[in-house]
């Protein structure tokens, strides 16, 4: 193995049965459960029972179908179209590529993850990560204890964007010398990678959320959430209370504890955000009204949907004329 990231169509070249059902792990051989055709980690066909029944089969012609793939900035990118391409720097653009490189995601270690089947369209799931206006209402007993609601810094990067949520700890940090400032102690950066991925570096790790449409039902989707631990410390012992507490957490807490913290954050998404999203879906399906309203304090929502529309060859969302409201 040369250590290079590769991606393949998960289908045996014999009769198309999925070769691997596990989401993650390590194997020297991947064996199809149907007829035991075997492949190595590079996707090459290395064995098949009764090979003589297939004549002079050239194994080099029957490896797993490889997909365009690239590992960059600690993240894995793959194109599901075998004839497509992957150019991460072109996808992200120069400015966002520099930011992702600076995060050093490759040094983070995986804590775990979860998968949710949700009764809402995948775009409604993305919307929940696009504003903090709802924090003091929907999250009044959870995230509102740590974040300022309806406050964010927002920037676009072509099709993508970055929103930084404001933590209440920023009130203490503003009194510190600038050389002790740490962005993830004062805020939570939320990157949206068009069209369906959220990347959130936190003070002790990283959350990645991907929303996949249900091909049979546009009113459902699957959210896959992954958690990662951040290894480096966040300051010096003589710096400040919050930084020192976080250092202690990183240096002494078992990974199981960090995983529980991450799982708790994911549960808020599942039990609060996605419950609201499912309610929105029911309203949309009722036919009672044909549009919703995005406020000026919700710029990410404007960008989400205008970017979707542009990709579909549609015009931008219309601006609301307040004088025409009933």
Residue ranges and their predicted role:
Residues 1-94:
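Rieske [2Fe-2S] iron-sulfur-binding domain
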Residues 10, 70, 75-326:
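C-terminal catalytic domain of Rieske-type non-heme iron oxygenases
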């Amino acid at each position: 193995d040369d250590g290079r990231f590769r991606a393949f169509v998960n289908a045996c070249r014999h009769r198309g049965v999925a070769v691997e059902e596990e989401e993650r792990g390590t194997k020297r051989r991947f064996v199809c459960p149907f007829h035991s055709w075997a492949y190595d980690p590079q996707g090459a066909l290395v064995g098949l029972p009764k090979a003589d029944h297939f004549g002079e089969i050239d194994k080099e012609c029957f490896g797993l179908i490889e997909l365009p793939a690239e590992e960059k900035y600690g993240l894995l990118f793959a194109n599901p179209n075998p004839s497509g391409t992957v150019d991460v720097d072109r996808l992200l653009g120069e400015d966002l590529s520099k930011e992702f490189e600076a995060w050093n995601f490759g040094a983070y270690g995986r804590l775990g993850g979860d998968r949710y089947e949700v009764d809402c369209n995948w775009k409604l799931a993305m919307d929940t990560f696009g504003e903090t206006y709802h924090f003091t209402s929907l999250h009044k007993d959870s995230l509102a204890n740590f974040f300022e609601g309806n406050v964010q810094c927002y920037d676009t990067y072509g099709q993508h964007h970055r929103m930084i949520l404001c933590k209440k700890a920023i009130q203490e940090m503003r009194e510190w010398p600038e050389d002790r400032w740490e962005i993830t102690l004062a805020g939570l950066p939320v990157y949206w990678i068009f069209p369906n991925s959220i990347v959130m570096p936190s003070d002790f790790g990283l959350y990645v959320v991907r929303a996949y449409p249900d091909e049979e039902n546009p009113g459902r989707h699957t959210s896959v959430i992954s958690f990662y631990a951040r290894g480096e410390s966040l300051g010096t012992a003589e710096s400040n209370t919050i930084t020192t507490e976080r250092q202690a957490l990183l240096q002494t807490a078992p990974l199981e504890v960090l995983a529980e913290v991450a799982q708790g954050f994911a549960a808020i998404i599942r039990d609060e955000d996605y419950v609201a999203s499912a309610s929105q879906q029911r309203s949309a399906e009722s036919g009672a009204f044909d549009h919703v309203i995005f406020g000026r304090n919700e710029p990410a929502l404007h960008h989400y949907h205008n970017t979707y529309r542009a990709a579909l060859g549609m015009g931008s969302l219309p601006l609301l004329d307040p004088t025409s409201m009933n």
